[in-house]
Design a protein with these regions (language model features):
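Non-catalytic signal-transmission and effector/linker regions of two-component phosphorelay proteins
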Residues: 1-31, 38, 127-151
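Short acidic, S/G/P-rich loop/turn micro-motifs used as interaction or catalytic elements
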Residues: 18-22, 65-71, 100-103, 127-128
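Acidic, metal-coordinating helix/loop segments flanking the phosphotransfer/catalytic sites
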Residues: 41-59, 66-69
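Alpha4 helix (beta4-alpha4-beta5 surface) of REC/receiver domains from two-component response regulators
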Residues: 73-76, 80, 93-122, 126
Length: 151
């Protein structure tokens, strides 16, 4: 009998601008493999934090929406969610998925990474190789967080 519990693949919580986009992203992650996707259909900060904590998410992908008048899905609002998730789950990695065509948002994204509010971001479509890299980084954090049982 091993004293170490076998660790499941990373639990990846996904929250995009609409429930449909969230479901599609979770389905895509399921097909990609190497993780357990969790679709968070509400993008209210409290709901996202609650579900991440309840599911013990290892990684959170947050979609942004830079349309005029949609401030609750902009970089700062998504960073607010990231801060709250990390307050409860310090080892949870957070990445923003940003739509292409908004170069004016790049300084805010870079600053968020510099301040360690988020772990990174993707502009445009998230490709499988980038997601695998993020999953690999998450697995390394998970391994470091596992401590052997002291007898």
């Amino acid at each position: 009998m091993s004293l170490f519990r076998k660790r499941e693949p990373p639990k990846v919580a996904v929250c995009f601008a609409s429930p449909t986009m969230t479901r599609r992203a979770a389905d895509w992650l399921g097909k990609l493999g190497g993780c357990k996707p969790i679709a968070i259909l509400s993008d209210d900060c409290d709901d996202v934090v609650w579900q991440c904590v309840a599911e013990r998410a290892d990684l959170l992908l947050l979609g942004t929406d830079f349309s005029n008048g949609v401030e609750d899905k902009d970089v700062s609002a998504r960073c607010d969610i990231a801060i709250e998730v990390r307050r409860k789950l310090p080892d949870c990695r957070v990445y923003l998925i940003c739509e292409d065509g908004h170069p004016e948002k790049l300084p805010a994204l870079e600053k968020a990474v510099e301040l360690k509010l988020i772990d990174g971001y993707c502009i445009g479509d998230l490709d499988p190789q980038q997601m695998r890299t993020w999953l690999s980084e998450t697995k390394e954090v998970m391994k470091a967080a596992v401590r052997p049982l002291q007898l």
